[in-house]
Regions:
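Ubiquitin-like/PB1-type beta-grasp interaction modules and other compact soluble beta-rich domains
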Residues: 1-65
Length: 65
């Protein structure tokens, strides 16, 4: 699979929610795109990843004046 442009190998079948935890992402302040489509936060546990998937994960950070 590809994660933010880098190749990753999935060792087992894994749900998106578990993958995010394993990779150190907090699901509270991120957006996930899977194969060109945004995944709603409520679906993270239902989405099973495969080696052919492409994920783009964007983390939101606070800041400003």
């Amino acid at each position: 699979m590809r994660l933010n442009g880098e190749t990753k190998t999935l060792k087992d079948t894994v749900a998106l929610s578990d993958f995010l935890t394993q990779e150190g992402f907090s699901d509270k302040r991120i957006a996930v795109e899977r194969n060109g489509e945004i995944v709603p936060k409520g679906e993270y546990a239902n989405v099973i990843l495969s080696d052919s998937d492409t994920l783009e994960i964007v983390a939101f950070v606070g800041g400003g004046w």
